[in-house]
């Protein structure tokens, strides 16, 4: 019954948004309330769950999205993004620029949460599209696929690292297996899949991209342009290394845990960009603040829609759907690796959150390791693969992709949802292949 209610809720949401063109935030909050009541929650519980979902989603994302938009706008409006884009196109050529973005996404994704890398790299994608004339999704999807793959398979990214800690898997082994799986997965879900998306003629959302083409004299140098963009990556990467190698009370680790926090790292990059890209190129502080102010207005509705997705997700979590699915799977006779993937996939589809799906799955299947002696590293990767399948309207990431790529709900289902499902299936096949070779 709980799964039928969820399916009905998703159908209602699609009808409201596609059929009646209801605003995304309003539709998500309304459907969250309807599903909550249908699942047996009382009015106060539904209200608290919606408020908690919005608060917890924005609590982690508001500063990241805000600072990311500010930094992206500064990089875009000062000509830095155009400089980086033209350099990449000149180095790799238009035909290979996708591969440049795949590599960039993998490197950036290792140190960052998906959302941080997404908002940081999108201005670069927009500028490459403007400079090359290539379709937006053809250029952007390979980068997004690379970011998503690191979220599933590659420590020291926080996602697989957290699952590996629960399973007590060796991080080096997990990284090795994950890298083997990553290569074919990102090729299929990125450059190959994006070739099917050239029919989607989309432009970047207004306010998130400056279409002005800068002259050679107006643009900063390549190294000056890239410096502000990579500062967050460097700080977060150092923080990740310190977390693995240094004791918790070590002063150096504590310092880099602070400056390597995603929001703090982005803020530091903004301060640096104000001087290296703004003031250094002759702009006044007032002009720079106007650029920063415009960036916030451009993402306001995107932020609210993501918050609505968080509310829907939290109602599903609080209604006990996760416990229902966990109980449903406890008595199955699936192999440990298939069980990890299946439980994570069901939880992902039902709850929306990849993180919640992965962590819950780890708790459900952890006893299996002791009984079956399954490879913990492969269990981590199977869980990560299952946790990203079929992202749809109850996932805040769905709305993030929709908003920044200027898509309708239907178009997002045919692009983002399919891409995430390809990553999940390729990941499972990779896990099973490695397991067959090793055992």
From Swiss-Prot:
InterPro entries: Glcn_transporter (IPR003474). Pfam families: GntP_permease. The keyword Disulfide bond does not apply. The chain crosses the membrane at residues 12-34, 54-76, 97-114, 119-141, 171-193, 219-241, 254-276, 291-310, 323-345, 349-371, 378-400, 415-437. Disruption phenotype: Reduced growth rate when grown on 5-keto-D-gluconate as sole carbon source. It is a multi-pass membrane protein. Keywords: Cell inner membrane, Cell membrane, Gluconate utilization, Membrane, Sugar transport, Transmembrane, Transmembrane helix, Transport. Transporter which is probably involved in L-idonate metabolism. Transports L-idonate from the periplasm across the inner membrane. Can also transport D-gluconate and 5-keto-D-gluconate. It has been reported that gluconate uptake probably occurs via a proton-symport mechanism in E.coli. This is Gnt-II system L-idonate transporter.
């Amino acid at each position: 019954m709980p799964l039928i209610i969820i399916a009905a809720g998703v159908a209602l949401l699609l009808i409201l948004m596609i059929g009646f063109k209801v605003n995304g935030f309003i539709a998500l909050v309304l459907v969250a309330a309807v599903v909550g009541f249908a699942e047996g929650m009382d009015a106060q519980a539904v209200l608290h769950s919606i408020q908690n979902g919005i608060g917890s989603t924005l609590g982690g994302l508001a500063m990241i999205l805000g600072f990311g938009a500010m930094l992206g706008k500064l990089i875009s409006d000062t000509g830095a993004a155009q400089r980086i884009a033209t350099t990449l196109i000149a180095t790799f050529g238009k035909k290979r620029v996708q591969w440049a973005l795949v590599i960039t996404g993998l490197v950036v994704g290792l140190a960052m949460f998906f959302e941080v890398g997404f908002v940081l790299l999108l201005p670069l994608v927009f500028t490459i599209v403007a400079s090359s004339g290539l379709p937006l999704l053809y250029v952007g999807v390979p980068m997004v696929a690379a970011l998503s793959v690191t979220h599933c398979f590659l420590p020291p990214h926080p996602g697989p690292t957290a699952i590996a800690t629960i399973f007590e898997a060796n991080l080096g082994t997990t990284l090795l297996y994950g890298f083997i799986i990553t290569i074919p997965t990102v090729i299929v879900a990125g450059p190959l899949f994006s070739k099917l998306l050239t029919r989607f003629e989309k432009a970047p959302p207004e306010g998130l991209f400056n279409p002005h083409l800068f002259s050679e004299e107006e643009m900063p140098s390549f190294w000056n342009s890239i410096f502000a963009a990579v500062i967050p990556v460097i700080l977060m990467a150092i923080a990740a290394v310190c977390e693995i190698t240094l004791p918790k009370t070590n002063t150096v680790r504590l310092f880099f845990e602070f400056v390597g926090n995603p929001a703090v790292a982005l803020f530091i990059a903004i301060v640096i960009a104000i001087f290296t890209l703004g003031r250094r190129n002759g702009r006044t502080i007032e002009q720079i603040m106007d650029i920063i102010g415009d960036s916030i207005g451009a993402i306001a509705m995107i932020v609210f829609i993501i918050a609505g997705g968080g509310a829907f997700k939290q109602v599903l979590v609080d209604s006990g759907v996760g416990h229902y699915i966990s109980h449903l799977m406890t008595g199955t006779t699936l192999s440990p690796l298939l069980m990890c993937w299946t439980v994570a996939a069901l939880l992902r589809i039902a709850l929306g959150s990849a993180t919640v799906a992965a962590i819950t799955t780890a708790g459900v299947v952890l006893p299996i390791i002791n009984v079956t002696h399954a490879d913990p590293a492969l269990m981590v990767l199977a869980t990560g693969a299952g946790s990203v399948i079929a992202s749809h309207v109850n996932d805040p990431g769905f709305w993030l992709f929709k908003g920044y790529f200027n898509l309708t709900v239907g178009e997002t289902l045919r692009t983002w949802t399919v891409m995430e499902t390809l990553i999940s299936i390729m990941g499972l096949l990779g896990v099973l292949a490695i397991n067959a070779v090793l055992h």
